[in-house]
Amino acid sequence: EIASCLVGSEMCIRDSLRTEHGLDLPRRLQIEFSTIVQRRTDTAGGEVTPAQLWEAFVDEYLPNPDPSKRWGRYGFRGLTQHSEGEGTDRIAVQLRVEDHESTIEGLGNGPLDAFVKALASRGVKVRILDYAEHALSEGDDSLAAAYIEAEIGESIYWGVGIDGSITRASLQALISALNRAARAGIL
């Protein structure tokens, strides 16, 4: 168990998130999150607890289920996916944009590519630069974590998704990146 980390210690931050929450962040996401922790944390004493790290991580990357604390322009409501032959998927994603719900559809080389194309049909241009995923524990009922590095506008944003379905986790990771871009005023 990790008692506290020096602010800015990427290794301690990585180990805390791995030990406490099962997350294995890609290297560039570790670097980005370390910078966020430095920016957000009161550095009196130069240390941050695992609980403070997790709070910062959730606030930055994960949707809050409490509607009064929800941030971000986009929200994931559900999806329907159909395989249409070798390497082609059709996806319909129920999406909240601001306070309006709609369904967007796309066809692509897998569900993530189909979602990117569905977003493009609505004028939201995204380019996936990196993608990683893993199970958070062993067993059939394990949650999956997905990490996406995306170019949105001319900026790079990481997103994180956690779900029982790797497809939903992947789409949520992309929505996380979109919401971070919206928070920064890009969208």
PLM-predicted stretches and their roles:
Residues 1-8, 13:
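Single conserved hydrophobic/aromatic residue that forms the stacking wall/gate
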Residues 17:
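Conserved, mostly hydrophobic/aromatic
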Residues 21-22, 30, 35, 39-187:
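Polyanion-binding surfaces on beta-sheet-dominated domains and ring/shell assemblies
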